[in-house]
């Protein structure tokens, strides 16, 4: 993109963008929730659509002059529905968190009981963490994973659900490397008379490509981010049955948000069109292949993988046998140009600020064009610096050499 005007108008921000672009080009990006959008998506986000206020929904706005942005929002909604075979879509949530809170606001009253996945077992802040508004306004009870297998014990979920009789069950995760059985969650929800919401933010791209069970076939409400594996702009969306459409739309506007971000909604539309292409399916297939290969290679280097491996785009590493915390591993890897995030592991003895693990994912490196052979190199980089932190210069050179093979925004 051309930043000639910005360079003159605001040299400080121009410099931030240049340095961040350099960092992205020169680093191996392994944060599972990050990706690299196309230039077409960025162009839509940087367009004149940012100037337009459009409170309301297409055809029912509170401002005049919305004829063109209505087209953009309709395209985004229609493409998203086609992508996931859904009856209704709301593309206005500014984030995945807003999408989740929007569903809660639509169907719950303060104090209602909800069953969600424990944050330290792979859930998300908005699934009832006590530090989040979800855990403050609603009575969240959590389920987790088995202590030995690190898999969801659906019979335990059923037992808890029958005990507490929640109004809503939330499925989905931010750090769970295995496939989730949405059909079983539907059966449990029906058994106790609960709504079922699935947060598919992390796996949306895999679902769109037909590589993971589609939660829209089972859930009353499905929320997602539009970035991560979906490779769109930062934002959120809600999919639901047509019978819930009005209550969901009302919960987002005027319930939770005011004016939608029309430039971002246009960028969402662009990314959804990209996701409907055959190339996108091939990309998602490679994401999974890369994650599986990276996991195998890390295991061969003595790393412990939570649940023993992965079915999706991410890996959760238990670093206790390496005598390093997640916090220190994140810092050490960052020093050589590998970006990961510290992450709690199930039944973690460390605090969330320290952690015993790191979460890594393959969406961003796959977007750059990396394949299985490159995962062998990445595993060597991670293994070498964790086991031999004194070899920082050598490993930094390995990172530089790998990144130079795969151009980014050039």
UniProtKB/Swiss-Prot annotation:
Keyword annotations of the record: Amino-acid biosynthesis, Cytoplasm, One-carbon metabolism, Pyridoxal phosphate, Transferase
Pathway: One-carbon metabolism; tetrahydrofolate interconversion; Amino-acid biosynthesis; glycine biosynthesis; glycine from L-serine: step 1/1
Localisation: Cytoplasm
Superkingdom per UniProt: Bacteria
EC number: 2.1.2.1
Species in which this protein is naturally found: Alkaliphilus oremlandii (strain OhILAs) (Clostridium oremlandii (strain OhILAs))
PROSITE patterns: SHMT
Top EC class, one word: transferase
Protein name: Serine hydroxymethyltransferase
Gene3D superfamilies in UniProt: Aspartate Aminotransferase, domain 1, Type I PLP-dependent aspartate aminotransferase-like (Major domain)
Swiss-Prot/TrEMBL cofactor(s): pyridoxal 5'-phosphate
Its biological purpose: Catalyzes the reversible interconversion of serine and glycine with tetrahydrofolate (THF) serving as the one-carbon carrier. This reaction serves as the major source of one-carbon groups required for the biosynthesis of purines, thymidylate, methionine, and other important biomolecules. Also exhibits THF-independent aldolase activity toward beta-hydroxyamino acids, producing glycine and aldehydes, via a retro-aldol mechanism.
Entries under CDD domains matching the protein: SHMT
Residue numbers of N6-(pyridoxal phosphate)lysine PTMs: 228
Site residues (Plays an important role in substrate specificity), renumbered to this chain: 227
An annotated GO BP: glycine biosynthetic process from serine
Protein residues bound to (6S)-5,6,7,8-tetrahydrofolate: 119, 123-125, 351-353
GO molecular function annotation: glycine hydroxymethyltransferase activity; pyridoxal phosphate binding
GO CC entries: cytosol
Catalytic reaction annotation: (6R)-5,10-methylene-5,6,7,8-tetrahydrofolate + glycine + H2O = (6S)-5,6,7,8-tetrahydrofolate + L-serine
